[in-house]
C-alpha cells in the first residue's frame, strides 16, 4: 500500500468514530454482506460513516492490507478494526457490538 493511500485511510478513521468500508453506501448497498452490515448498524440507531470502496480502486485494495482482512465490508470503531459482516452479526447477537458502541458514545 502506498503512503498516500494509507494516509487517506488514517484520515477517514480519524475523522469518523464509526466507519464502514463497504460496497455501495448505506442507502444502496451493492452486495448482501454490505447490506447485512448496514442493517445491523441501522438497528443500533447510531451515526456512522460509510466509504464506498467500489468508487476507489486504491482504497479497495489497500483496506484489505491495512486490516489484514481479505473481505469487504469492514467495520472500524474508534480506529479499531472490528470485522466483517459475519463478525458484526455475531457481536450484535451477543450484545458485544452494542456494548462497544455504547462505550464509544460515553466518551
Curated annotation (Swiss-Prot):
Q: Does the keyword Lipoprotein apply?
A: no
Q: Which positions does UniProt annotate for [2Fe-2S] cluster binding?
A: 31
The domain of life is Eukaryota
Ranges where the Glutaredoxin domain occurs: 6-107
Give the Gene3D superfamilies listed for this entry. Glutaredoxin (3.40.30.10)
Any one GO cellular component localisation term in the record: mitochondrion
Provide the binding site for glutathione: 23, 60, 85-86
Concerning PROSITE patterns, the annotation shows: GLUTAREDOXIN_2
Q: What sections of the protein cross the membrane? A: none
Q: Which UniProt keywords apply?
A: 2Fe-2S, Chloroplast, Iron, Iron-sulfur, Metal-binding, Plastid, Redox-active center
Q: Which Pfam families match?
A: Glutaredoxin
Q: In which compartments does the protein localize?
A: Plastid, Chloroplast
Q: Name one GO molecular function term.
A: metal ion binding
Has the keyword Iron-sulfur been applied to this entry?
yes
Q: Which family does it belong to?
A: Belongs to the glutaredoxin family. Monothiol subfamily.
Q: What is this protein called?
A: Uncharacterized monothiol glutaredoxin ycf64
Q: What is the lineage of its organism?
A: Eukaryota, Rhodophyta, Bangiophyceae, Bangiales, Bangiaceae
Q: Which gene encodes it?
A: ycf64
Amino acid at each position: 500500500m502506498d503512503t498516500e493511500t494509507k494516509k487517506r485511510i488514517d484520515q477517514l478513521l480519524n475523522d469518523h468514530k464509526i466507519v464502514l468500508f463497504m460496497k455501495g453506501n448505506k442507502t444502496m448497498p451493492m452486495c448482501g454482506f454490505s447490506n447485512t452490515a448496514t442493517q445491523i448498524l441501522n438497528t443500533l440507531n447510531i451515526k456512522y460513516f460509510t466509504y464506498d470502496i467500489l468508487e476507489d480502486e486504491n482504497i479497495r485494495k489497500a483496506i484489505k492490507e491495512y486490516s489484514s482482512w481479505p473481505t469487504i465490508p469492514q467495520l472500524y470503531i474508534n480506529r479499531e478494526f472490528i470485522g466483517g459482516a459475519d463478525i458484526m452479526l455475531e457481536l450484535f447477537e451477543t450484545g458485544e457490538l452494542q456494548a462497544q458502541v455504547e462505550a464509544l458514545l460515553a466518551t
